[in-house]
A protein has these predicted regions:
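Secondary-structure end/capping motifs
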Residues: 1-66
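Conserved C-terminal helix/tail region of periplasmic/extracytoplasmic solute-binding proteins
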Residues: 42-130
């Protein structure tokens, strides 16, 4: 509950601190099931040695997130719907407008801590950098 309200306890016994935008639920397609995010999660599992990289495994991971169901559920509402189902993860440096099938959508910076971007079409190259 505190995370959703942007009030985070940083240390035991301290009062929660207000951290604006610690977690947002809808803006910038935060809850959209990007296939590229499923692919990135799979890549992290491979990097950590939790799974062995395989074509069928990678394909299965990408089928887990269902943007088709999300779009069907929100069709005709005010919810902006991205036109793409995958994107370059960690590649947005500044607020950028993205193509939609419904509404207007701005995506904010999403850089990863290590500065690397993840292209779901370049899994082998990404893993080779690990």
């Amino acid at each position: 509950e505190r995370a959703i309200s942007d009030r985070i306890t940083l240390a035991a016994g301290q009062e929660p601190v207000h951290i604006p935008d610690f977690m947002f639920q809808h803006r910038e397609a935060a809850n959209f099931p990007w296939v590229s995010q499923a692919a990135w999660l799979y890549a992290q599992m491979v990097r950590a040695g939790h799974v062995v990289k395989s074509g069928p495994g990678y394909a299965a991971a990408q089928r887990v997130f269902r943007p088709d169901i999300y779009r069907a559920a929100f069709a005709g509402t005010q919810v902006p719907l991205p036109g793409a189902s995958a994107k370059l993860e960690g590649g947005i440096n500044e607020t950028t407008g993205v193509g939609t099938v419904q509404g207007r959508l701005l995506m904010g910076p999403d850089r990863f801590f290590d500065g690397r971007a993840f292209d779901p079409d370049q899994l082998d190259a990404y893993l080779a950098q690990s």
